[in-house]
């Protein structure tokens, strides 16, 4: 067979598996250390630049690049419980202070077990196998207190206060005089009336309760308000009546129908739940009197005995760049619950009890995504997943959303591409849409994006602002696809 020699201007089509007679002149059987260029033809592949050498064995580590500028780049490498940071320009190890070895523990290859997102000097590191839990700290139990207060006083009026323990009523009464004498005006002032009942409780009612074996009660007066404290664990009720349709003398223990049923003066730390309909199953919120008797106010707080926050040991951790070649690692500080009862209001984030599969920053919020849900932090605060109030839904409140879109497909990875937060699973990709509105609970919905086969082995990678790359296995081969977006919607691929 005759060997022929000829010049080819380019081999830009690369290696071809077609027969020699079928393939074009810009293809070949094999190349070694070559780079195909349309203008320059086949040139030698660019060589590597030696920086440093290490004696370190890795199987399939997790690698994350932190690029602070053209001349300051770092590689974070994790495998097992070992974390190291290398300066890409010098090849030298950086100083890492702190230890998060417990959070790094994982099974299987590290590459698939971790994800990292860097914003500014801070890298948020996610262990995709760690199940999130609530912390052990609970809000304080409510003291065994009751409150009675006067809103007004009237002439020739009978006022009654009843403390009921089991089936026994302990009753004290006071009747004001008529208005026949000018001096009688003193006897209808609210502070005077409260003082009369305080004296009666201390001299008559509380001794009777103690004699019956129910323990010691105390009472404190704050202006026209009486705060009664009973023994811890004792179940008792309190109610009042008056001759003005029960509008002058009011009492409550731990629940009221509205803030108008609360006194303007109380003692610091008194807690009450507000149920606007008065029904037992109504959605409540909780208030606490904070401050002095004459200067304090009612402030929304967490219900008694409720978990205050997330267990930081199970949440994403922080790798912070504190200076050139200097890093610290630690758990993050997550915001605590400020209001609600964790059951009907300010409920636990849906990722509690599950591993977080992916994280992304979007619109000033940190999104934590599980297999079926996405939880976005409070606006402009990536570390808060509880609302500021249980009374209303603020535009800045966290968002907890079911992103399954009616499918059983698990979410493997997420990516922000085309200006949208996308959720990627096999044969189903969706995205978070708010139209032209800012991201908030009442404007958020999940829309279908595409139906690509996707094995989840590698997360999709955004390319610029309008496209992304993703790969998936096709039999023994792998396929790389670039998807283009317009207005966040897939418009084509190569």
Residues of each region from the PLM?
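Surface-exposed loop/edge segments in extracytoplasmic proteins
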Residues: 90-97, 168-173
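Short coil/turn segments that connect the beta-strands within blades of beta-propeller domains
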Residues: 71-73, 120-121, 363-364, 418-419, ...
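Long, charge-dense tracts
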Residues: 105, 113-115, 122, 128, ...
């Amino acid at each position: 067979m005759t060997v022929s020699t000829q010049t080819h201007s380019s081999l830009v089509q690369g290696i071809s598996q077609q027969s020699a007679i079928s393939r074009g002149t810009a293809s070949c059987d094999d190349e070694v250390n070559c780079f195909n260029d349309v203008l320059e033809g086949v040139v030698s592949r660019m060589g590597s630049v030696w920086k440093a050498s290490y004696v370190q064995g890795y199987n399939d580590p997790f690698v994350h690049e932190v690029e602070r500028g053209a001349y300051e780049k770092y590689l974070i490498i994790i495998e097992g419980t070992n974390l190291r940071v290398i300066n890409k320009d010098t090849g030298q190890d950086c100083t890492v202070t702190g230890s998060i070895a417990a959070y790094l523990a994982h099974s299987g290859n590290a590459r698939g077990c971790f994800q990292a997102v860097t914003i500014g000097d801070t890298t948020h590191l996610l262990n995709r196998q760690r199940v999130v839990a609530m912390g052990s700290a609970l809000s304080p139990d409510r003291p065994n207190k009751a409150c009675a207060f006067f809103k007004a006083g009237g002439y020739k009026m009978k006022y009654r206060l009843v403390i009921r323990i089991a089936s026994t009523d302990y009753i004290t009464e006071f009747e004001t005089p008529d208005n026949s004498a000018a001096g009688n005006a003193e006897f209808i002032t609210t502070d005077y009336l409260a003082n009369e009942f305080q004296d009666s409780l201390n001299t008559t009612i509380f001794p009777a309760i103690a004699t019956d074996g129910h323990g010691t009660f105390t009472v404190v007066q704050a202006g026209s308000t009486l705060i009664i404290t009973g023994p811890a664990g004792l179940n008792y009720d309190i109610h009042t009546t008056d001759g003005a349709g029960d509008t002058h003398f009011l009492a409550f223990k731990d629940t009221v129908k509205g803030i108008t049923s609360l006194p303007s003066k109380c003692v610091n730390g008194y807690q009450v739940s507000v149920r606007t309909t008065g029904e037992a199953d109504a959605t409540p919120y909780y208030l606490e009197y904070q401050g002095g008797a004459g200067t304090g106010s009612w402030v929304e707080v967490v219900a008694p005995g409720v978990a205050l926050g997330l267990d930081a040991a199970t949440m994403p951790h922080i790798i912070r760049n504190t200076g050139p070649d200097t890093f610290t690692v630690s758990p993050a500080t997550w915001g605590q619950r400020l209001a609600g009862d964790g059951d009907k209001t300010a409920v636990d984030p849906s990722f509690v009890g599950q591993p977080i599969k992916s994280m992304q920053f979007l619109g000033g919020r940190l999104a934590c995504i599980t297999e079926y849900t996405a939880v976005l932090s409070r606006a402009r605060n990536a570390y808060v997943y509880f609302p500021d109030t249980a009374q209303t839904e603020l535009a800045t409140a966290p968002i907890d959303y079911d992103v399954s879109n009616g499918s059983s497909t698990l979410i493997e990875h997420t990516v922000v591409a085309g200006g949208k937060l996308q959720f990627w699973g096999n044969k189903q990709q969706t995205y978070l849409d708010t139209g032209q509105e800012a991201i908030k609970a009442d404007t958020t919905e999940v829309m279908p994006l595409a139906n690509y086969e996707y094995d989840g082995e590698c997360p999709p990678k955004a390319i610029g602002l309008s496209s992304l790359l993703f790969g998936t296995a096709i039999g023994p081969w792998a396929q790389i696809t670039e998807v283009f977006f317009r207005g966040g919607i897939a418009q084509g691929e190569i």
